[in-house]
From Swiss-Prot:
Function: Negative regulator of class I heat shock genes (grpE-dnaK-dnaJ and groELS operons). Prevents heat-shock induction of these operons.
Protein name per Swiss-Prot or TrEMBL: Heat-inducible transcription repressor HrcA
Origin: domain of life: Bacteria
Family stated for the protein in its record: Belongs to the HrcA family.
């Protein structure tokens, strides 16, 4: 009973510190929380939690504040992600429903997430490696060169030069393009490469075998491209309100390292909990500039029938934990949404906002409104 009560005390300390950003003492815990024990007992529990590394006392006469270990315990035991209010959901739908392209939706999402959380928001566009083929066109541009224009399911347009020994007739190139579009629609780029090689080996395509092989090579090259096309960031001005000004310079440096940031948040979005979000705290990120920060990330992507948000409320919250797990497991992440803030951020609210925006973008992709 003593240990379980101590964990209740820890939870209360974390909640109060997140709210006030001031060291928390036993007197305020006794007054504000129904812990069922005296102030002296709570004081002993807090001392024990400090010995165990969950709390720290910044000054002898001050109360306690959570450590990374304390925040991690708190986050891992959040029973549920607090659902957004109906007004918040309506606001998200209203603001994002005006998006006319995926790029527009991603830019709007970054701005909105930053406004909701009061923190830095980062939204990545999908990489080619996670995309599926929607359409390809091949256009001769020189005696031995074609330009392959590849359009993916996320609306991304990629161009790739194809070098061949000799140029076939335009009609033969168009026939190959039509066959590739028929057989590769909806396939990943790596699967598309395999299919194109099979087409090249089949009867009737001898004259365009060199073109097909070059196109397959291009698909394979694109399939290895894990980089996000764009990284949209909003809300760096919120950092100016930080109480720890000494932490700002390394944090700004970390935000400038977009490759490191993308890798961190992409990995985190793939290591989500049952609520569909991942959280990294301080030194867990192994990035000096983020030592005093936390990151919340969630993937967005393709959704199957069971996971698609229904009706006119794509950010509508699931009613049960099993529904949340179903939606999470039924979505194949192809990019991420994230929020970066102080370690004393409101984790429950931030996790809810990140998840809601990720679910909206998943619905947006499912509707196919991705063309610029």
């Amino acid at each position: 009973m003593t240990q379980s009560r101590r964990m209740l005390v820890l939870r209360a300390v974390v909640e109060d510190y997140i709210r006030s950003q001031e060291p928390v003492g036993s007197t305020s815990l006794t007054r504000d929380h129904d812990l069922g024990v005296s102030s002296a007992t709570i004081r002993n529990d807090m001392a024990a939690l400090e010995d165990e590394g969950y709390l720290i006392q910044p000054h002898t006469s001050a109360g306690r504040v959570p450590t990374e270990k304390g925040y991690r315990y708190f986050v891992d035991r959040l029973a549920t992600v607090v659902p957004l209010s109906e007004a918040q959901r309506r606001g998200i739908n209203s603001f994002l429903s005006g998006s006319v392209s995926l790029k527009d939706a991603l830019q709007r999402s970054a701005r909105l997430l930053s406004e909701i959380t009061g923190q830095v928001a980062v939204v990545a566009s999908p990489s080619l490696a996670k995309a599926t083929l929607r359409h390809v066109e091949m256009v001769p541009v020189a005696m031995t060169t074609l330009l392959a224009v590849v359009i993916t399911d996320t609306g991304r347009v990629a161009q790739h030069g194809l070098t061949i020994a000799s140029m076939p007739a335009v009609d033969e190139i168009n026939r190959l393009s039509n066959t590739v579009n028929e057989q590769c629609d909806g396939l990943s780029l790596s699967k598309s490469a395999e299919t194109v090689r099979s087409i090249a080996a089949s009867a009737g395509y001898e004259s365009v075998r060199g073109v097909a092989d070059a196109l397959a090579d291009a698909f394979e090259s694109m399939a290895l491209d894990e980089r996000a096309n764009e990284l949209y960031m909003s809300g760096t001005s919120h950092l100016a309100h930080s109480r720890s000004l000494a932490d700002l310079a390394p944090l700004f440096d970390a935000l400038e390292e977009q490759v490191v940031l993308m890798k961190l948040m992409s990995n985190l979005s793939e290591e989500t909990n049952a609520s569909g979000v991942g959280v990294a705290i301080g030194s867990e990120m192994h990035t000096p500039g983020l030592l005093h920060a936390s990151v919340v990330s969630s993937g967005y992507g393709r959704s199957g029938a069971a996971g698609e948000p229904a009706g006119n409320d794509p950010v509508g919250e699931p009613e049960t934990e099993s529904e949340t797990e179903s939606q999470t497991n039924d979505t194949e992440p192809i990019a991420f949404v994230g929020s970066i803030g102080p370690t004393h951020m409101d984790y429950a609210a931030t996790m809810a906002a990140v998840r809601a925006v990720a679910r909206y973008l998943t619905a947006f992709l499912s509707e196919g409104r991705t063309q610029d």
